[in-house]
Design a protein with these regions (language model features):
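Alpha-helix capping/helix-boundary segments
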Residues: 13, 49, 90, 109-110, ...
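Residues that scaffold the ATP/ADP-binding catalytic core of kinase and kinase-like folds
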Residues: 16-18, 56, 133
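A general alpha-helix detector
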Residues: 13-14, 52-56, 93
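Active-site neighborhoods of divalent-metal-dependent phosphate/nucleic-acid chemistry enzymes
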Residues: 81-121, 125
Length: 142
């Protein structure tokens, strides 16, 4: 599934799903994940999101490395998540996007990866970071 109906889950939403300190946001994020695991909705996730998730959750001691591996493996092996990644061509596109929209490279890399995979929607807490005309950013935690 691609196009207007598919959403990519940004790293911040994924991190909240495993955050015991942010109970309200965590509950909403867990609900989104659960719907995907149950096959009630489709989500996309990039390898970049998974790497950022490991960094964010283990750096702040929210998860052990073993727990992070289990969580990433659950997502990676699930058939209900569309997994996407970037190439060298995507990196060039991301640099161009970063320059044009004056945005951080890592956000532009995610935007370029989405565009190359036909995904135009993103669930993110950082709606302001995705102002490209081809992306609809939605904060599901609001």
């Amino acid at each position: 599934m691609t196009g207007p109906e598919l959403f990519l889950m940004d790293t911040n939403i994924l991190v909240y799903a495993y955050d015991k300190d942010e109970t309200e946001k965590s509950g909403k994020a867990k609900g989104i994940l659960a719907k995907c695991f149950l096959g009630e909705t489709d989500l996309a996730i990039s390898n970049q999101n998974l790497a950022e998730f490991v960094y964010a959750t283990t750096r702040k001691s929210k998860l052990s490395f073993d727990q992070a591996i289990v969580n990433i493996t659950d997502i990676f092996t699930s058939t209900t998540f569309k997994k996407i990644s970037y190439t060298a061509k995507t990196v060039i596109s991301a640099i161009e996007i970063a320059g044009e929209f004056k945005m951080p490279f890592w956000d532009s890399l995610l935007a370029a990866t989405m565009r190359e995979n036909g995904i135009f929607n993103i669930y993110t807490e950082n709606v302001k970071d995705f102002k490209m005309p081809w992306i609809k950013a939605v904060n599901p935690l609001a």
